[in-house]
Amino acid sequence: MRPTNKRILDAAMQLLVKKGYRATTTKEIAEKANVSEATIFRNFKNKQGLVEALLSQHSSNRGSILEQTEGDLYKDLLHIGTCLLEELEHRKDIIKISFREPAMFQDVINHVTEYPQSMKQLLVDYLKTMGEKGVIQTGNEAEHADVFMSIIFGYFIHRLHLGDRVISMPQEKMLEHSTALFVKGISAD
């Protein structure tokens, strides 16, 4: 990516998170990025083009996550949960934008939910495999995945909006503790 486009996208992200889509103008983005407004129009066509470019920056590779599992339920779920939380953290600005003006940003919301949906399917597939091996209770893999993801999402959203004012447990400890509780709840024995 050209340095000019990176500056424009960085400025757009900062302003969109701070002010929202409607309140942010291309003129403000241009000023913050130290470019002319014409440069924005030439490179991105309009403000919606900027949003689309921001979304295209946030693609992930979930396939390698399962390749790094070991067959140990606790370690694997800890790894999957850590990857999910790291990806959410990586996408937090896009998520903030989608929360500010959800009616305007159906494309953003669709983009934001794409990764978690694919992670849920990955988790369901993993849990089915572990069920077939007799490690966990079978038959409720989708529900188990929903619960596990809700733990991760709940922590992320809480931190996004409230910081550590209520849940002060560090991320690593929260992941370890909640994963241990979850594993205990779904284990076959």
UniProtKB/Swiss-Prot annotation:
Q: Give start and end residues of each DNA-binding region.
A: 25-44
The lineage's top-level taxon is: Bacteria
User: One GO biological process from the UniProt record?
Assistant: regulation of DNA-templated transcription
Gene3D superfamilies reported for this sequence: Tetracycline Repressor, domain 2
* Keyword annotations from UniProtKB, A to Z: DNA-binding, Repressor, Transcription, Transcription regulation
Key word Transcription regulation present: yes
Give one Pfam family, short name only. TetR_N
- HTH tetR-type domain residues: 2-62
Q: What is the name of the protein in this document?
A: Uncharacterized HTH-type transcriptional regulator YvkB
Q: Name one GO molecular function term.
A: transcription cis-regulatory region binding
Q: Which residues form a coiled coil?
A: none
| Keyword Zinc in annotation | no
Gene coding for it: yvkB
Matching entries from InterPro entries are given as: Homeodomain-like_sf, HTH-type_Tx_Regulator, HTH_TetR
In its UniProt entry, the species of origin is given as Bacillus subtilis (strain 168)
